[in-house]
Every structure is written in C-alpha cells, then in structure tokens.
C-alpha cells in the first residue's frame, strides 16, 4: 500500500496479485486507488501518468485522460475510488505516477501517486 498527499489531495493505492488471470511470463495485478479531497477547494482529476517498472528494469509509461473513463470532480471531503489492472512480464515490479488536478479556480497541479509494489506472493524469498 502507498499513500501520498499533495495540496490536499490524498492518493492511496493497494495492489493484489491475480493468479487466476496470470500465466508464466504474464503476471496480472489489480490495484485499487482512493483519491480524497482533504483540502478546502474543489478539484477535478483531468489526466493520469503512470510509470510501470518490472524486475528486469523494463519501464512503461502510460498517459491518458481521466481514470476508468471518468474525470471525477471532488468537493472538499469527497473521495473517488476505482480498480484497474496491470500486467508484468516478471513476478514483481512497481508503479508510481501523478494525477493532473485542476481546481475550480483554474489552478492546476500534479497529485503524487507514491510508488507501490506489484509482487507475486513468495517471489521475493
């Protein structure tokens, strides 16, 4: 699990290995993200940037609008939660990134997604 707070936006991520959807050389992980506005100003998530690293050092960058087809607008005290998936070629790696947020006054900033592990249980022993 990882948590980061940037300008009142808290991003918490939990990842889970999905053995039923994995096979050798293709390891599927789900991750659940909770984005909470702990600040005093409404803000909208407009885009995302993920950096995915596997155990061999291979790096993939994913950039796009919104998350799961949405651009959630969060009033102070509100949160948004979603689950998505990532496939690695190795049994462990990590993800990190940023969400581009825009406050109602037009000010934009990048909310940090702290690094979190993607690990097949027992693969690091």
Curated annotation (Swiss-Prot):
Matches recorded under InterPro entries: ApaG-like (IPR050718), ApaG_domain (IPR007474), ApaG_sf (IPR036767), Uncharacterised_ApaG (IPR023065)
Domain ApaG span(s) in chain numbering: 3-125
Disulfide bonds: none
Listed transmembrane segments: none
Source organism superkingdom: Bacteria
Stated name of the protein: Protein ApaG
Organism: Anaeromyxobacter dehalogenans (strain 2CP-1 / ATCC BAA-258)
Lineage start: Bacteria, Pseudomonadati, Myxococcota, Myxococcia, Myxococcales
Gene: apaG
